[in-house]
Amino acid sequence: MSHITIANDELRKQFQYYERFGLHVANGNSFGLGAAQAAYEHGEDWYQALLSYLKENLDYLDGALKARVPQVKLVYPEATYIPILDMQALGMEPEALKHFVWDEVGAALNAGTTFGPGGERFMRINVATQRKNLELFIEKLARALEARK
């Protein structure tokens, strides 16, 4: 279940148009509605544990980068679990960086260029994952950079 706010009048009209045709984009099912209610009424402990876990993963990633790959800097997110990796110090052009991360490191990160001008040489990484995935990423990134020397 999710919530949507559409400030743009034209986009809201388009959304409402499609909604009328029964695409069920605005209607939750009984399981989803019950789960959402339970989460709002009884989910505070789980939510706080999740926030703690995400913070621990961010801190792990930051420390591991500083220790193993200091030329890559973590930019802590302001409100999400998807921080930005500042990879400018690697000296790669944006397309080369994307292919390096995707093909040589083997990580499906979001290229910063996807998000507009200024995103060159930056990548987004999702830390809402198991710690072992972040450990594997650090290991593969360090090895791929070492192989390029």
Show which residues each predicted segment covers.
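PLP-dependent class I/II
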Residues: 1-149
